[in-house]
Every structure is written in structure tokens, then in C-alpha cells.
């Protein structure tokens, strides 16, 4: 499963016991040099209404508690004024930038989600330190290095199920 910077919500008809080991695996399309780590959150339907409206808990991964891991991170994206323009962003750490519009890779005119009516939207969560680098030196081949364990769509030698 490739998530594309969004989220997936799935429910089970039973609880998953915490044995202290690897109790759940969420595989994606990762391979060595191409990890897109997703932080996993879980919730128990305590009120029994079948809705995801109870307390959510972030599962610990190998980067939990490290100084370079930012808890309560927030990034705000801004709607471009015209089609085929970069999406500007700011975060709560004082950083800003833009997501380049790459017409050669995508046919849609906007990266900004069309279903969001507001001119900006903010996402909050945990931010892992980036491990990607340009192996080509010219921006044509990027390597996304894996984390040790505990993330979805992450090629971990420890957390592999096969």
C-alpha cells in the first residue's frame, strides 16, 4: 500500500494483544533505499459506537524519544493562486518552503487538495528526521534510508515479516 502523505484507517473485529514483541505488521511498497515511513496510531473502540472517536495512541518506533524527533509538529500548506504552481508551507519550528510543481511527473494542475475549501490547512503529528539524500548529485535519483523498526512502509531488516 502506498499512502502518498495521507492516512489509512482500518478496523479489526478483535483486539490485538500486546505480547511485548512484534504484534502487528503494516507492509507497503518499500525496498532497500526506498522507505516512506508511516507512524502508526491505534485506538480501541471503548464506547462501542464503531466510530474512530476514542483516544488514539501513537505506537513507539525506533526514533521515539530521540532529540531529533519532533513531537507535536505542525505544518501548514497554502493554496497556490494559480494552477501548476508550487505549494508553499510553514511549520511550527520557524521553517518554510515550497513543494515544487513537477509537471513531467503529474498530470493534475494542483498538488493542493481540491476537496479542501480553505486557503490553508494544517497537519499535526510527529516529524521524523529526514534521511533522504540525492545519490545522483543532480536531483534525478533520491535514496530514502530506512529506520530501524516500528513504521509502516519502511524497509527494516528487523521488522521484516519475510
Regions from the language model: what does each represent?
Residues 39-41:
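Beta-strand signatures of extracellular beta-sandwich domains
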Amino acid at each position: 500500500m502506498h499512502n502518498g502523505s495521507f492516512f489509512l484507517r482500518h478496523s479489526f473485529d478483535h483486539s490485538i494483544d500486546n505480547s511485548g514483541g512484534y504484534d502487528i505488521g503494516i507492509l507497503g511498497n518499500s525496498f532497500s533505499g526506498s522507505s516512506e515511513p508511516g507512524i502508526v496510531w491505534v485506538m480501541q473502540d471503548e464506547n462501542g459506537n464503531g466510530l474512530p472517536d476514542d483516544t488514539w495512541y501513537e505506537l513507539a518506533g525506533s526514533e521515539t524519544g530521540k532529540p531529533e524527533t519532533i513531537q507535536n509538529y505542525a505544518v501548514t500548506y497554502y493554496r497556490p493562486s494559480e494552477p501548476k504552481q508550487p505549494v508553499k508551507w510553514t511549520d511550527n519550528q520557524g521553517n518554510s518552503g515550497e513543494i515544487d510543481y513537477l509537471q513531467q511527473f503529474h498530470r493534475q494542475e494542483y498538488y493542493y487538495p481540491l476537496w479542501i475549501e480553505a486557503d490553508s490547512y494544517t497537519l499535526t503529528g510527529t516529524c521524523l528526521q529526514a534521511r533522504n539524500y540525492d545519490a545522483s548529485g543532480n536531483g534525478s535519483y533520491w535514496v530514502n534510508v530506512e529506520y530501524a523498526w516500528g513504521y509502516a512502509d519502511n524497509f527494516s531488516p528487523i521488522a521484516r515479516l519475510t
